[in-house]
Amino acid sequence: MALLISLPGGTPAMAQVLLLLSSGCLHAGNSERYNRKNGFGVNQPERCSGVQGGSIDIPFSFYFPWKLAKDPQMSIAWKWKDFHGEVIYNSSLPFIHEHFKGRLILNWTQGQTSGVLRILNLKESDQAQYFSRVNLQSTEGMKLWQSIPGTQLNVTQALNTTMRSPFIVTSEFTTAGLEHTSDQRNPSLMNLGAMVTMLLAKVLVIVLVYGWMIFLRWKQRPAH
């Protein structure tokens, strides 16, 4: 579902691990249905959840029936809070909202019809609705359309624990402020690889924590 604007011419330790594994997005069947009658639309997950201090990826994709102009001038923008809310990111300027300075990355390549918005160092105040908007030049003029329901981001507090795991596995995506990946391979494949790597790292944490707990219990057994 999308709105079109057309302009002619233009344990404590284990609990923490499980909480991290719960971060992600829910693609509900009725979240963003294709509207083939109109032939254009934007697809986003219905809900995403993350942990304070962590990061979250909001995937998006879009489709359209028009023939692109020689210079399509394709760009992606994101709004938050409501459909007519403030713009937090615009790839054509580039622009990034003060609230998200140094914390937003758009993994999208010019000409591609899918990508990912990554929010780093999540804050409680980031909890809101997020809407992606597409802008391009077609042979029929400038076309602009946006997701209507958007994606609801829920941010949960990290668990405060006194017990620390002796094993720490970190997965970090380094960036300096705003990054617009205009010279990369297919971002969907790159994001899939990153998600698989992060999942394997989290599974490794669980295995190591369980192993450490079993080792401690074995050490504490009375000698016969």
From Swiss-Prot:
Regions crossing the membrane: 196-216
Topological domains, Extracellular: 29-195
Residues bearing glycans: N90, N107, N154
InterPro entries given in the database record: Ig-like_dom_sf (IPR036179), Ig-like_fold (IPR013783), Immunoregulatory_rcpt-like (IPR051694)
Keyword Transport part of the UniProt annotation: no
Localization, UniProt: Membrane
UniProt topological domain (Cytoplasmic) ranges: 217-224
A GO term, aspect molecular function: MHC class I protein binding
Tissue: Widely expressed with highest levels in spleen, liver and lung. Predominantly expressed by natural killer cells, macrophages, and granulocytes and dendritic cells (BM-DC).
Keyword Cytoplasm: no
Example GO biological process: myeloid dendritic cell activation
Subunit structure: Interacts with CD99. Probably associates with DAP12.
Name under which the protein is recorded: Paired immunoglobulin-like type 2 receptor beta
Organism of origin: Mus musculus (Mouse)
The organism's taxonomic lineage, starting at the top: Eukaryota, Metazoa, Chordata, Craniata, Vertebrata
Gene: Pilrb
